[in-house]
Amino acid sequence: MHEHYQPREIEAAAQLFWDEQKSFEVSEQPGKETYYCLSMFPYPSGKLHMGHVRNYTIGDVISRYQRMQGKNVLQPMGWDAFGMPAENAAMKNNVAPAKWTYENIAYMKTQLRSLGLAVDWSREVTTCKPDYYRWEQWLFTRLFEKGVIYRKNGTVNWDPIDQTVLANEQVIDGRGWRSGALIEKREIPMYYFKITAYADELLESLDELPGWPEQVKTMQRNWIGKSRGMEVQFPYDQASIGEAGTLKVFTTRPDTLMGATYVAVAAEHPLATLAAQDNPELQAFIAECKGGSVAEADMATQEKKGLPTSLFVEHPLTGEKLPVWVANYVLMHYGDGAVMAVPAHDERDFEFATKYNLPIKAVVRTSAGDETPAPWQDAYGEHGELINSGEFNGLDFPGAFDAIEVALLKKNLGQSRTQFRLRDWGISRQRYWGCPIPIIHCDSCGDVPVPQEQLPVVLPEDVVPDGAGSPLARMPEFYECSCPKCGAPAKRETDTMDTFVESSWYYARYASPHYEGGLVDPAAANHWLPVDQYIGGIEHAILHLLYARFFHKLMRDEGLVSSNEPFKNLLTQGMVIAETYYRREANGSYTWYNPADVELERDSKAKIIGAKLISDGLPVEIGGTEKMAKSKNNGVDPQSMIEQYGADTCRLFMMFASPPDMSLEWSDSGVEGAHRFLKRVWRLAQAHVSQGLPGALDIATLSDEQKAIRRAIHLAIKQASQDVGQHHKFNTAIAQVMTLMNVLEKAPQGSEQDRALLQEGLQTVALLLAPITPHISHELWGQLGQSGAIIDAGWPALDESALVQDSLQLVIQVNGKLRGQIEMPASASREEVEAAARSNENVLRFTEGLTIRKVIVVPGKLVNIVAS
């Protein structure tokens, strides 16, 4: 055994062993308990960042621990390889996205391997490869034929210069991020998944996920947004509108119907179009609304604006004429593109009515009283007793809901209904680097799915996009084809799928990644699924996790999987944060400096008082800790850390610095501390092994001192087992091992029994650290004379008898103050403990002249003597 800890050699040897032995390749083993551990697969952006390292280390610790529990563990890895960053990089570097992506995958794979992950690389999937997306297209055609996927017009952000559709995040202050052109809203045909058909089940089956964080489930519940309300119809005022009809609105507050003072419609609503015919001002306003963002979040924060029309509708219960306004806060794709405005009890309506001097009529008695003067108060939105509502006065919310529904039903102008905030999932993207949508457009036959035998529709990989629209739409060699039904010349769909589609089913493909008979081999899928432990960032709480749950139900209904949910347990790991440093330039901009380029200045108490740039010695500002990001230049390159300290040190620091679900603050001194600890473990083991391995430990003949050491060993096993196995508190498990090391380093090594005890201690350290620092544990296990690899060893068994103490140290208090300690046999009775405490020298001193009123004995811990 080498005298010094040499992580590079140790880690290379361990990884070579695992590769040669195919240690982590698994197959279905009927009868053996399975465990499927999965971390969200990475986007191949170029190189790993510390967030990746943390995510994959957490998954690896759990996987290795479960293997030590005797389970057949699957931990696969792949690449979420389609997406816009590849197109942007391609335009910047004039290189095909495919080439850029595959080069990044190759580099990042070597980085992941250097971490020593227990990954079954034989199951690797890459979502931009035809052998993967072929099955996505196969499922698409089946769902299209069933009507679960359909085509309709959708509103998008259109860049008139680049002639392309932009995602909401590519629209900056109403302009295209690349061209700077003013963005228009356009209606274009798009494909949609009918996720709303599963809304009830997606909501209800959240209750079947006790292993998910409550926060994530709440976010999904809110996103699905089930609400019971009323569909109310306002008859057209025929004198102003010129025809009969009704304006439909949905409201969750029908109790406030008598307080409606106007109605507002979206810019795209037919009444807005009608009103604008001879109104240039309204036409200009509608065009402005259509140029705004289509994102709901932007709508909520933007200034409320509107224009009146000359149109009116009638109140369904009073017949009163209400003016129709066009407003920018009404969304065409929510409800029916119209709202009944009750300014007294809705904040948006209040803001709008106050701005345009519209009537505000209070109809609910709230904790703020019977009036609703400006400014808006949250109390105005409360439920309460109805006022100013005619026959409905005095009713509470449930009573008013029912009574108003009866009144509306009599007039055939309304009824209660359940509505969801969730909208069908539009998956068409006018982009190149994505999975082609397998549809052919025929003038005679309409939209025809590509037949199964013609799949996959392969995306050409030698294309360099230029940012002006989809390259596929300019490639006749791609889109010209024959109709599969009638044989006539037809046109292939040139849109590609949202990249969230690929990540919605990848976890299932890992069960049978090379299966040629379908999307999954049902037998393999049902063997491994659902995933036992899924790990990823909370930022995926809604979209990815909701879409994956939806896809799982689609696959179930296609007979591909038998379970209802994809992920049994979910761990959302915290961010990796680090200090930021900057200088503010003369023009007001910020220049950010990497922590590695900054030197800290400290006072005599080691408190940081300033910082300066190493290169010029001039001061920089300390910006506080933030998430590691390119924009703040506060990232630490994992590769340089691994090269300097080794993967085990990085893994140990990551797991020790904080619990996995909390933010982790990067600390160079913390990394150095982790490295020092591993050197201590190595040093103790090396000194022990160099003297030759001892014989077996004879537990029956241990001295009291030796029993205390063995108790420390088994106490560490007990605590670490709870921390790792039940709570994923890897940081406290590591602390237990550190405490044990303190004991072992001080343990005597004079006798054969002493050395046999140290052998048990070192074996325990190796086993407890094996999931966290697998390379050094692999080496130590062999050096300690153990046969077989540590990855095939079981988690250390707890010997409960080792925890039993012959004698106990008890604290003595007089009137609650510490006055001494006594050592008592563990078997001592309460009376014996009390007698020993009363006769203790210190107790006698502090109770002299006092009467002992009461003696409280807390078994195994303390004695408190109350005297006065």
From Swiss-Prot:
**NCBIfam families from the xrefs?**
leuS_bact (TIGR00396)
Task: Output the GO biological process annotations, alphabetical, semicolon-separated.
Answer: leucyl-tRNA aminoacylation
Where in this protein would one find the motif 'HIGH' region, according to its record?
A: 42-52
Query: Which organism is the protein's source?
Result: Pseudomonas fluorescens (strain ATCC BAA-477 / NRRL B-23932 / Pf-5)
| Record GO terms (molecular function) | aminoacyl-tRNA deacylase activity; ATP binding; leucine-tRNA ligase activity
Question: Under which EC number(s) is this enzyme classified?
Answer: 6.1.1.4
Q: Which reaction does it catalyse?
A: tRNA(Leu) + L-leucine + ATP = L-leucyl-tRNA(Leu) + AMP + diphosphate
Motif 'KMSKS' region extends across 627-631
Q: Which PROSITE patterns match?
A: AA_TRNA_LIGASE_I (PS00178)
Q: What is this protein called?
A: Leucine--tRNA ligase
What's one Pfam family the UniProt record gives for this protein? Anticodon_1
**What GO cellular component is one of the record's annotations?**
cytosol
Q: Where in the cell is it found?
A: Cytoplasm
**Is Metal-binding one of the keywords?**
no
Mind telling me which PANTHER family this protein's record contains? LEUCINE--TRNA LIGASE, MITOCHONDRIAL, LEUCYL-TRNA SYNTHETASE
Family under the similarity heading: Belongs to the class-I aminoacyl-tRNA synthetase family.
Q: Which HAMAP family match?
A: Leu_tRNA_synth_B
The residues that the entry says bind ATP are K630
InterPro entries per UniProt: aa-tRNA-synth_I_CS (IPR001412), aa-tRNA-synth_Ia (IPR002300), Leu-tRNA-ligase (IPR002302), Leu_tRNA-synth_edit (IPR025709), M/V/L/I-tRNA-synth_anticd-bd (IPR013155), Methionyl/Leucyl_tRNA_Synth (IPR015413), Rossmann-like_a/b/a_fold (IPR014729), tRNAsynth_Ia_anticodon-bd (IPR009080)
Query: Domain of life, per the record?
Result: Bacteria
